[in-house]
UniProtKB/Swiss-Prot annotation:
Coiled coil location: none
InterPro entries named in the record: Depp_CoAkinase, P-loop_NTPase
UniProt-listed CDD domains: DPCK
UniProt xrefs under Pfam families: CoaE (PF01121)
Protein's organism: Rattus norvegicus (Rat)
Domain DPCK: 3-207
Top-level taxonomy: Eukaryota, Metazoa, Chordata, Craniata, Vertebrata
Protein name, as recorded: Dephospho-CoA kinase domain-containing protein
Binding site for ATP: G8, G9, I10, A11, S12, G13, K14, S15
Molecular functions (GO terms): ATP binding; dephospho-CoA kinase activity
GO terms classed as biological process: coenzyme A biosynthetic process
Keyword ATP-binding in annotation: yes
Similarity comment: family membership: Belongs to the CoaE family.
Gene: Dcakd
Keywords per UniProt: ATP-binding, Nucleotide-binding
Amino acid sequence: MFLVGLTGGIASGKSSVIQVFQQLGCAVIDVDVIARHIVQPGCPAHRRIVEAFGTEVLLENGDINRKVLGDLIFNQPDRRQLLNSITHPEIRKEMMKETFKYFLRGYRYVILDIPLLFETKKLLKYMKHTVVVYCDRDTQLARLMKRNNLNREDAEARINSQLPLKDKARMANHVLDNSGEWSLTRRQVILLHAKLERSMEYLPLRLGFLTGLAGIASLLYLLTRYLLPSPQLGNPGSKP
């Protein structure tokens, strides 16, 4: 099995593309969902965030106040690095747990929905393939203005706060162009899924895993045969 990192930009259509992959039966892990899960009350990351930033980052119900925490690390590289040092290991741990579940279920590849895949670069080394859901800037701007009921200035400000889609597209292995009709985008997704399914890149890991299991089974057999006492089949000195 191998990992496919998928990203996009605001109003590029990434969520719709993810839905098509899921309809095709693909395994999808949303890293944003994991990031929210690992900071829930009672989780190690939640406790460490409170220790590092104080109780002012908590809501009345004990949840992390994401806006307050965001304000605390805004333009504060040291604080941002501290927060990342708390959350990123937990995110990777949960990500690997979810990935292993899909591995055991026989999936050939798993899609990781990672909004900041190229910005943070932390997870890139785990990805066999990277996919960007792209659309041209004019289309992105028009969609965002309509979807969020924004004026042009506010919509442009939101787009400009992200790494440009054209830059992400240059860094990706695969680009799904969502600038035109949705039917064309959907066909691109179907073709990419077929290509990834045909890939043999999942075999080395699966063969290695099966080889490891065979080795463990052989070791257990030898230990059972040579180290445990043999059962008594009868008493040679007894009379019939």
